[in-house]
Amino acid sequence: MFQQLQKYQWIIVLLIATIGGGLCMDAGHEWGDDFAMYLHQAQCWIDGGMHSLLSTNKLCMDESDGLVGPYLYPQGYPLFLSFFMRFFGLLGVQGLSLIYCLKWANYGLFLIVLVAYLRWLNRVFDGHWGKIFLAFVLVAWHPKIWEAADRLTSDLWFAGLVILFFQTLGTPFKGWISKSLTLSLLVFVATATRSNGIFLIGAWFVWEWLDYRKTESVDNRVVSLMMGTMAGLFALYADAGNGSNHWQLLKEIDAKTIVHNFGVYLEMAGSYPYWHLATLLKLLVHPLLWLAVLVFWVLVVLGFKTHNSEKWAMGVFVLLNFGLYIVWPSVQGMRFLFTLLPFLMVFFVGGLGVSWTRAGLPWLNRQSWIPEGMKSVKFVVGLAAAVVLVQGTMTSVFYTRLDTNQAFSKDIQGVYDFVDGQVPIDGRISFHKPRLMCYVTGLETYKIATDYGKETVGMDESVSGGLGLNAAIKKLRANQIDYWVLSKEQLARKEKPSLPIVFENKGFVVYAVAENQGSLTDSVKVD
């Protein structure tokens, strides 16, 4: 029985990952409106109108409070989505069903790419089953990866491209031109998905340099590297044409932010193998969490030291990305580390292997009371994999009971219907997710004074320091906003806006900001 399971072990691992991620998926989407912009751009690849979207979104981003997002996202991921949008559209799939199918396409392709990761691990660990299996399930079964299956963002797609690049980098080709073209294409698509895809060129340079020192053969390395560099730079140039405003954040870089981000990302990555336990430690005994994080990074360094020359290419890519994340003022969360996790898990498992050989196994052998079967590599690896699976299962069970469809809930759908049917085409709306409202209704939407009430729930305005009502209305009218959409949750305060209500349901209220836009007598109320 065990031999049969071992024969199909990788299929079983991927099947479990498919079920785990699938249980986390919900029809619709959570609030984050990055996905709405991705879908909007993907739709433009099918129907046209990208220039119009750029103009509209640029206006929205420039006039909204704070930095909401770029004028356009890099086109790699929207183009990927557009193929599936067209395919599912031909099958008649629309609405929330389309979003659900796109989630499966996004996650399913990542699972397919994990086959390349498996082949890469086989090369890196020289066929050592225990290390390969543990490193593989640490990615395939991890709760954060399964959780990401419920989001239409470029995280898994970009991580998959990086995995394919490194697998291709170490794979022999019959001809240099075919390998160079493949690597250059991957650099282009990765950089066209996220700007830090350009760091793959750094890893490529290191790989070729080390291989040159070993073989002393120049061959066509210079031409290959030039092809890859040109591909990456062209992708950056194409994205720069979108006028991305994210570079404004670089003005906020300071030493305090860098130190803070350094600690945040060290803790975040160091908590990855024992994610749920780390969350518990963070709430109860934070010093123990830092001890666990320290152990992780010690093992990563130890694993790095024991690997072959391929480690330098991986290490350069990890350090370049870590450097970018640390100096970037906005903390992005675990999803941005997805690209680095395949490498960190290789080093982490490598460090575990060294520790097991030098300390773990000798200690176990001295414990005569422990059964011999529990001292085997298969048992220890299986136990560690079970811990990862339990964490993933906890997340999947939690998501089956959680309705993550915030962006298309019944209440917000009522707002969309009102805006679509009652608001003039030239109406200007203020909503906390402007790109989502624009994608659904097609109307100009801005994020202006949408935090009104959030920071002052249950507090006097003088205590909270939040935006006052008069200041909010003045700001809205100065920006020529016609309709102000607020959630009732954020309006749990003493002073509610003294503006005409034109629409109201259990979750949201739409106020007419302009003095001639409506009155209480003609408002629409929905139970």
Describe every region a protein language model picked out.
Residues 22-23, 27, 197, 351-354, ...:
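Transmembrane alpha-helical segments
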Residues 148, 155-157, 161, 190-193, ...:
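Hydrophobic/aromatic-rich transmembrane helices and adjacent perimembrane loops
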